[in-house]
């Protein structure tokens, strides 16, 4: 049985943080003046100090990494590093004067002046409070990566450059993890960083060809994970081989008006039909025959007994539960607690959860050993990614549903919003889902314990 617990990552209220005048000073040649050092093993909480430590480490990281990746030295930033706020002077950036309205709640690299600037009043304190120090470091690493691109003369579409910057940021996060406690990836730090990237994703429906495109949440988290897993060398290949961008347009004005979401009662029948067709085709490729799932049933945890194979499921195990009952060949989901939470995220959050239950049914039919809950869960997440890719590519026989903008992001948001009992993090679940989406079913088997 799978029971989910609601996590606070994406439901934290916005609370204003009091800000004081910065004690940081910056040289025009890009050198950060010495400031307070964090004792070994101590984590910093003040956003200004977090930024300072991140920039110092990023300079050192790229001084050693750039010659290895691009066979050239990293030259210090000519314009340095400039924090700003609504009441402080803004840096110049080329011929166009900057105003706070333009750059509020933002961070940027200005190629014309070769400087990195950030809103230290209305961006970083909020990110720090909601998503933690690692996310603040990630934002600075992303902008630093743009300075690297400028020096390496990397050219490409805007979205390619932005995703490469996310990838380089992921490579730095993997490298800095054991060196600076403030940027440790232990616990839920990587999940919080993923939530931060989702916060900074493109608005729904922005095409990948747009001059302002940074990528969907799925695109950005995928690029970050590739850098984290495969290092800066993998990121450097983006210039010659741009990563795929999953930019899904709205299909109609009505689709845009609803944010691409269907009510669950309208979604269920075509979703089940697509799942049945998908798994029948997948089993056919394996030389097997798919046995359709008998039922999908929502239940009320407090509305009377729920049975599986004639045995009553304890009431305290039903709240926020979604499970596949082998004996009854039925996918069950808490229709009072879990279902409304999924629907609030978006229709494909529910679609992903039901696809996952179908994947568990597939494990049973294929005789896969699911005794390792964590491995079996990641395998199911991977197969969910394979299904999502088939929907996206319109490869399902007699397909009835088509993805809308934000659908893949809804899967990741659900991973972040709900914690399971098997110990897998949202970061790990997203990686498993991404592997299935990008590579198909082949890597899914490797996730089994």
Describe the predicted segments one by one.
Residues 144-159, 171-178, 358-372, 389-392:
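Catalytic Zn2+-binding segment of zinc metalloproteases
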Residues 14-18:
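C-terminal motif of bacterial Sec signal peptides marking the signal peptidase cleavage site
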Residues 121-138, 153-159, 335-352, 368-374:
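Short pre-active-site segment immediately N-terminal to the catalytic Zn-binding motif
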């Amino acid at each position: 049985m799978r029971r989910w617990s609601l996590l606070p990552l994406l439901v934290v209220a916005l609370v204003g943080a009091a800000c004081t005048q910065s004690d940081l000073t910056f040289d025009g040649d890009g050198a950060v003046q010495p400031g307070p050092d964090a004792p070994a093993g101590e984590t910093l909480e003040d956003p200004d100090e977090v930024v300072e430590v991140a920039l110092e480490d990023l300079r050192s990281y790229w001084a050693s990494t750039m010659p290895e990746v691009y066979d050239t030295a990293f030259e210090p930033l000519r314009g340095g590093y400039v924090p700003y706020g609504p009441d402080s002077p803004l840096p110049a950036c080329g011929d166009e004067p900057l105003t706070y309205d333009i750059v509020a709640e933002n961070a940027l690299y200005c190629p014309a002046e070769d400087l990195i600037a950030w809103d230290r009043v209305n961006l970083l304190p909020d990110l720090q409070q909601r998503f933690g120090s690692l996310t603040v470091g990630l934002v600075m690493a992303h902008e630093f990566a743009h300075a690297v691109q400028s020096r390496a003369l990397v050219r490409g579409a805007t979205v390619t450059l932005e995703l490469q910057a996310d990838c380089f940021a992921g490579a730095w996060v993997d490298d800095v993890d054991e060196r600076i406690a403030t940027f440790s990836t232990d616990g839920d730090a990587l999940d919080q960083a993923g939530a931060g990237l989702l916060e900074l994703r493109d608005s729904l429906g922005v095409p990948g060809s747009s001059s302002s495109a940074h990528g969907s949440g799925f695109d950005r988290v995928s690029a970050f994970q590739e850098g984290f897993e495969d290092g800066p060398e993998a990121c450097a290949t983006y210039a010659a081989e741009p990563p795929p961008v999953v930019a899904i347009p709205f299909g109609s004005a009505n689709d845009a008006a609803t944010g691409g979401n269907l009510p669950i009662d309208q979604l269920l029948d075509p979703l089940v039909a697509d799942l049945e067709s998908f798994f029948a085709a997948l089993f056919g490729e394996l030389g097997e025959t798919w046995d359709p799932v008998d039922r999908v049933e929502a239940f009320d945890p407090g509305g009377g007994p729920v049975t599986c194979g004639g045995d009553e499921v304890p009431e305290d195990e039903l709240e926020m539960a979604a499970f596949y009952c082998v004996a009854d060949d039925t996918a069950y989901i808490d229709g009072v607690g879990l279902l409304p939470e999924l629907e609030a995220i978006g229709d494909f959050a529910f679609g992903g959860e039901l696809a996952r239950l179908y994947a568990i049914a597939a494990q049973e039919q294929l005789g896969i050993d699911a005794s390792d809950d964590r491995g079996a869960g990641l395998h199911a997440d991977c197969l969910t990614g394979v299904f999502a890719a088939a929907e996206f590519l319109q490869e399902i026989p007699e397909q009835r549903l088509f993805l809308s903008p934000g659908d893949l992001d809804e899967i990741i948001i659900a991973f972040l919003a709900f914690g399971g009992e098997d110990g897998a993090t949202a970061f790990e679940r997203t990686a498993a889902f991404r592997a299935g989406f990008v590579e198909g079913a082949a890597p899914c088997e490797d996730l089994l314990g």
